[in-house]
Each structure stands twice: as structure tokens, then as C-alpha cells.
A protein has these predicted regions:
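Ligand/substrate-recognition segments at binding pockets and active sites
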Residues: 23, 30-129, 220
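Detector for C-terminal structural segments
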Residues: 1-26, 74, 78-88, 114-236
Length: 236
């Protein structure tokens, strides 16, 4: 899910992401460590979906393979090793006839050298909550909001919205619908359960339409006598 687990609970004690799972029809199943829930019925075979995607993209002028630029800092063996594993994952999952990961480098600043000139094909980046509400996460991907950091600086979808091409219409319609759902949820301020249910609908819509794809949860562990939530950089 896009929102981190454990961020917030409704008045019945239900953890928020379980509401998203219910909206997506995944509440009765759990990840088995091998096959994604939505691909489990066919054993993880994406060949039909891949064929459909290539046909639809070819129809609007896309040529294959698509080259995805992924930037890492130059001179870092760890970053290169990680990117090499990711490149192999692309090969194994998509096939080099569909998507090829191109490993590229920046010297010192990903912001100045990659993000600002919009050279990235995608970015793997984390987000931490400032306070315990789903809008912390979902609000980062909306349109028509200068505070939607990811829309403006990572996916650049906010800039696409200013003058979308014909082939981008369906995508922009989906983002507009998602934005409306988030704004409607955020307007509910006197009923916590209704607010979380509405946000869950928005998040499910985002995930089902793959407006963004969650990658992993980064969980840090430490052994300490201090209360982590009493520190200056506590999550919220």
C-alpha cells in the first residue's frame, strides 16, 4: 500500500491499510512471499498483460523496448550493485523486449543533475509521515496543489496537467478522479471513520490504476532505552 502500515487506526481499532485492502478485495488474502495477490490466480504469469500493454502503447506510437533511465551516484559500489540487481529484476520480470533499465549516474546532486532537468524515468523514494493521517501520503500525488511535492518534482504529472497531449487524456482523467477522491476525503473533518473510509477509496483507486507503484517498506530497528517518539525527529 502507499500509506505506511501503522500510521493510524479508526475508532473501531482497524488499521488504516486494512481498509484499503478491503476496498481492493484483498482483505481475505495475504501475501505469500512469492506471488502478488492480484497475479496469484494465474501463477504470476503476466504474458497476457504484457501483450496487451505493448499493443496499446504501440497504437500511440511507443516503440520497444522502452528504455527506463535510473540514476545512481557515481563511484558508489553499493549503489551500482543495487542497480544491477534491479536491472536483472526488470529483465526477469518484463523481458528485454519490453522494458530495459538503463543505469545512469550523477556526480553529486540528484536534484540539480537529474530531478530539475527531468531526466529520470522513475524515482524510488521514501516518504515519512508528519502526523497521523492518510493525507500525509496521498496528498503528495494530487493535481492542482503546490504542496503536492511528488506530483511537482518526481513524476512531474502536475506539469503534464498544464497541457496534456491527446494520448495522455486517459491518464490525466485518472489523476483528476484520484485528486477529487482525495479532496473529498480531506474535507471530512468531523467523522474519523468516514474520513479514513474515503481515503481508503482514494488509495485503492490510485493503486488499481497504478498512478504510482509502492516498492517496499523501509523499517529501521534499534535497541534503545530512549522513547523513540520523544526525540526531535520522531515520526509524528
Amino acid at each position: 500500500y502507499y500509506t505506511m502500515k501503522g500510521l493510524c487506526y479508526n475508532t473501531q481499532g482497524a488499521e488504516y491499510t486494512t481498509l484499503v485492502a478491503k476496498e481492493m478485495g484483498f482483505d481475505a488474502e495475504k501475501y505469500d512471499g512469492e506471488t502478488m495477490i492480484r497475479l496469484r490466480a494465474n501463477g504470476g504469469d503476466i504474458s497476457a498483460l504484457k501483450k496487451q500493454a505493448m499493443e496499446e502503447l504501440s497504437a500511440i506510437g511507443v516503440t520497444f523496448p522502452v528504455h527506463a533511465a535510473y540514476h545512481i551516484i557515481a563511484g558508489s559500489t553499493t549503489a551500482l550493485d543495487t542497480a544491477t540487481v534491479l536491472k536483472q529484476c526488470f529483465t526477469d520480470s518484463f523481458g528485454d523486449d519490453f522494458i530495459v533499465l538503463d543505469i545512469k549516474t550523477f556526480v553529486s546532486s540528484i536534484t540539480q543533475e537529474v530531478r530539475n532537468p527531468q531526466l529520470q524515468s522513475f524515482v524510488i523514494n521514501g516518504w515519512g509521515a508528519d502526523f497521523g493521517d492518510p493525507v500525509n501520503f496521498l496528498g503528495q500525488e494530487t493535481l492542482h496543489d503546490d504542496n503536492a511535492f511528488y506530483s511537482h518534482y518526481y513524476s512531474n504529472i502536475a506539469r503534464v496537467a498544464e497541457a496534456p497531449a491527446d494520448y495522455q487524456k486517459d491518464l490525466m482523467d485518472a489523476f483528476e478522479q484520484y485528486t477529487d477522491l482525495v479532496n473529498a476525503a480531506n474535507a471530512i473533518v468531523n467523522d474519523t471513520d468516514a474520513r479514513y473510509e474515503a481515503f481508503a477509496k482514494a488509495e485503492a483507486y490510485m493503486l488499481e490504476n497504478v498512478l504510482v507503484s509502492p516498492t517496499y517498506y523501509d523499517i529501521a530497528w534499534s535497541l534503545t532505552h530512549a522513547n523513540e517518539y520523544s526525540k526531535i525527529n520522531a515520526m509524528y
